[in-house]
């Protein structure tokens, strides 16, 4: 089934409850496979960001709200001007662009640390559940 048909078939299916993000899997040795997508391990906090009617709620992978801890991320996500559910990771980058988990744990909103939200996946857009589409199309 083509992408357009999949979108039309599933356009009214909504995501109505908290979604636990997929987590990385540890392996015994490195491998390469064209059927897999490889991503950087950022060493941050996994987060699901829900943007709805110009309101943003950021959840940890366990469902804890993170808005109070990372208001700059919520403010930035509001600027998207779309309703969306985004899976990503909150990190603090050091001067070399590497994630620093210790600095993330110590993060204070006024600290000037380089706080970022790296999006991995778009789960819904403007009320449409798009999880049925292949990751590379989302």
Predicted regions and their residues:
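Catalytic cores of nucleic-acid ligases and guanylyltransferases
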Residues: 1-138
């Amino acid at each position: 089934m083509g992408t357009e048909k999949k979108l039309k078939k599933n356009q009214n299916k909504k995501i109505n409850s908290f979604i636990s993000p997929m987590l990385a899997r540890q392996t015994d040795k490195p491998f390469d496979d064209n059927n897999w997508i490889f991503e950087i391990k950022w060493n941050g906090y996994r987060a699901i960001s829900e943007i709805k009617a110009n309101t943003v709620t950021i959840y940890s992978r366990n469902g804890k709200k993170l808005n109070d801890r990372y208001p700059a991320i919520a403010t930035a996500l509001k600027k998207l001007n779309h309703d969306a559910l985004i899976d990503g990771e909150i990190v603090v980058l050091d001067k070399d662009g590497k994630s620093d988990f210790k600095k993330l744990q110590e993060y204070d909103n006024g600290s000037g640390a380089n706080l970022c939200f790296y999006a991995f996946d778009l789960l819904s857009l403007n009320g449409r559940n798009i999880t049925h589409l292949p990751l590379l199309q989302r």
